Amino acid sequence: MAAYMIVEVETTDEALMAEYRKHTPGLVAKFGGKFVVRGGKTRTLEGGWTPSRVVVLEFPDYAAAERFYDSPEYKPVLDMRLKAGKSKAIIVDGHAS
């Protein structure tokens, strides 16, 4: 069953975030993932959630998403994102058909 990594990002260092974005597509693909949402228009429907940017990645399964996030290859890239702004991230299982 597919799993999704959902990341809310508020960028404070555009140059560093641009560098981060150069490295992520290849790493995401290496772990079987793909971008489903990469920014774009948002509309708050409930609560006070007003994200400036949302990214959704799809992986073949929960374990693949964890392998990507916890991988030694991603660690230095993740550090770039964490220095380039504030973020929140979760992994969630998809719906079994």
Predicted regions and their residues:
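Short S/T/G/P-rich N-terminal loop/turn motif that feeds into the first structured element of a domain
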Residues: M1-V54, E58-D70, D93-S97
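C-terminal structural segments of small proteins and small subunits
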Residues: A65-I91
